[in-house]
Amino acid sequence: SGASWTEEARGTNAIGTALVEGAPLRVQGGEHFLEANGFLTCAASPIFSPQGQLLGVLDISGDQRQSPSHTLGLVTTAARMIENRWILSRHQRDWRLHFPTQAERVGSAAEGILALSPDGTVLGGNRTAMQAFNIAAADWGSLLWSDISPQPLTQLLAQGGHPSETVQTVPLHSGRTVFARLVLSNKELLIRSGRALRPHLAQTPVPQAAPVDALAQLD
């Protein structure tokens, strides 16, 4: 059944406090307020579902005399990567908008991600996107992309080449602009790939075999 790391059972600790605060944090040495844990340094980050539900906590604990200074950054990045992979897996049949912090930093753990239906309904997203667009967990399923940006999804599709490879500048109703990359569902990509191939196949001439003289073959 595991061990309880509530404050009542273990004193102040990173796991229990991260669950309550819903944010990454570190607790070191005497901050645990429990003599038995006074030698520890703990860094923890909560993990949320694409719908904003708290799923658990990722924690790194060790002897504070040997703990590297970047532990909190490491556990925070790892939690973000888990959340992002969860979105990619759960919403592979939906459209996704990825928001890199810079145009050349596509696919980093820090980028925001929103999952959408083809009609523009926002189905879920990661914490970065929720904070960037001021989205609450209660908004999922009722929020539309048109509530966030005046630029239609169809216009994002029409610009540039392959949608999943094209980073575009997108305006927001707030007056800001963001970098965005539209990724279609696996099914939609297959359909569009087939449509793109049909004109090419239709225009490709089929080589004609030279006529064969049947009588000449009897000689």
Regions found by a protein language model. Name each.
Residues S1-G16, L74-T76, Q102, S108-H173:
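PAS-family sensory domains
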Residues S1-G22, Q28-T41:
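Intrinsically disordered, low-complexity polar/acidic regions
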Residues E8-T12, G16, V20, P24, ...:
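Juxtadomain coupling helices with adjacent low-complexity linkers
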Residues G30-E31, F39-A44, I148-P205:
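PAS-family sensory/regulatory modules and their coupling/dimerization elements
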Residues E31-Q64:
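Extended hydrophobic
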Residues A202-D219:
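AAA+ ATPase active-site-proximal loops
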